[in-house]
Amino acid sequence: MIDTSSTVTSPFGVQKVGKGKSPVLPEEKDPSFNVRDRLNDVLLSEKHIIESYTTGSKEVLCQQLYNVVTENLSNLKLAQRHLFEELFNLGEYQADIAAQPQIDDALDMFTKYKVQLPYPQS
């Protein structure tokens, strides 16, 4: 699970949600294939596989095969999430902390976009 209460300060003083770099990861990127590279490589592969399964799930005619494909797709999404969480916990991913006005602006913008959708609003 991602701990969104963890914060770090960037070298330029910006507060971010995230963790500091793990000592497991090399300080500088180098030509060696390390833990970070392996996890990022697997994460990218999972993203491509998920896209293929998503397309396939929309085009399957047999209900039984559809059920298998969608179950596999669900499991792949969980695996991708776990990989992302692992990279987050190693300090590979961080996000800026948004102030309430920034959150309000984003919510307002997407609420306005929502009314443009051709789907019924709930």
Regions found by a protein language model. Give the residues of each.
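Amphipathic alpha-helical hairpins
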Residues: M1-S122
